[in-house]
UniProtKB/Swiss-Prot annotation:
Keyword Transmembrane among UniProt keywords: no
Lineage, opening ranks: Bacteria, Pseudomonadati, Pseudomonadota, Gammaproteobacteria, Chromatiales
Annotated function: Prevents the cell division inhibition by proteins MinC and MinD at internal division sites while permitting inhibition at polar sites. This ensures cell division at the proper site by restricting the formation of a division septum at the midpoint of the long axis of the cell.
Residues passing through the membrane, by range: none
Native source species: Thioalkalivibrio sulfidiphilus (strain HL-EbGR7)
Family listed: Belongs to the MinE family.
Listed name of the protein: Cell division topological specificity factor
Length: 85
C-alpha cells in the first residue's frame, strides 16, 4: 500500500499549482508597476519612427528598463528585416 501512496503524493494539488502561478503573476506585476508610465507610449512612438523608413511588425521593438541601485538603464532592441541585395 505504501508503494501506491508514494506515487499519489507526487501529484501537485490544484491549490498548490494555483498558488505558484499567482506568485509568478504578482512578481511580474511588481516589476511592471515600478516602471515608468511613459514606456508603452515611448515604444509606440519609436515604432512609428522606424516604420517611416522600414516595414516592421508590432513586436519588432522591445524596451526594458533595468535598475541597479541608483542607476537606470533603458534597453532598446529593434529587430529589422533582412535587406535583400
Amino acid at each position: 500500500m505504501n508503494f501506491f501512496n508514494y506515487f499519489r503524493s507526487q501529484k501537485k494539488k490544484s491549490a498548490q499549482v494555483a498558488k505558484e502561478r499567482l506568485q509568478v503573476i504578482v512578481a511580474r506585476e511588481r516589476v511592471h508597476r515600478d516602471g515608468p508610465d511613459y514606456l508603452p507610449r515611448l515604444q509606440e512612438e519609436i515604432l512609428n519612427v522606424i516604420r517611416k523608413y522600414v516595414q516592421v511588425d508590432e513586436d519588432a521593438v522591445s524596451i526594458q528598463l533595468e535598475r541597479d541601485g541608483d542607476c537606470e538603464v533603458l534597453e532598446l532592441n529593434v529587430t529589422l528585416p533582412e535587406h535583400k541585395a
